[in-house]
């Protein structure tokens, strides 16, 4: 095991321990590590759905989660900000050629260029 990630079982507790308050999140203050909070939220949702947590790295590329769903291995990229482009997801797709990829963000449902877009509020749909 070369590296690992740790997640807290409760995003509220994580926010409190990190000293983040709701005002900072609502205002979109850049000093708040919103990406880590969002990724942690998705991790807890995946665990609740029974998925073991795996991720993928290669060089400077990292895909947040890799799950097995209906005998398919699917990469999941989590985006907390408006920019949903992911070079790492593209690297993974070029290397492994999954049937499709999943992007979880604040954007609506959609499917474009082999990427299934799922809004954060609907992670339970996985």
Model-derived segments and spans:
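Short catalytic-loop micro-motif centered on adjacent basic/acidic residues
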Residues: 54-55, 75-78
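Catalytic cores of nucleic-acid endonucleases
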Residues: 80-120
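A broadly conserved detector of short glycine/acidic/proline-rich loop/turn motifs that flank catalytic sites
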Residues: 12-13, 59, 71, 80, ...
């Amino acid at each position: 095991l070369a590296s690992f990630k740790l997640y807290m079982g409760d995003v509220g507790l994580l926010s409190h321990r990190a000293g983040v308050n709701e005002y900072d999140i609502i205002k979109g203050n850049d000093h708040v590590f919103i990406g880590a909070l969002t990724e942690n939220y998705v991790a807890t949702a995946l665990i609740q759905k029974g998925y073991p947590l795996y991720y993928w790295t290669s060089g400077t590329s990292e895909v947040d989660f890799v799950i097995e769903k209906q005998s398919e291995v699917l990469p999941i990229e989590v985006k907390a900000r408006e920019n949903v482009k992911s070079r790492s997801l593209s690297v993974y797709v070029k290397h492994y050629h999954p049937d499709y990829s999943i992007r979880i963000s604040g954007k609506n449902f959609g499917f474009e260029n082999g990427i299934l877009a799922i809004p954060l509020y609907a992670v339970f749909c996985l």
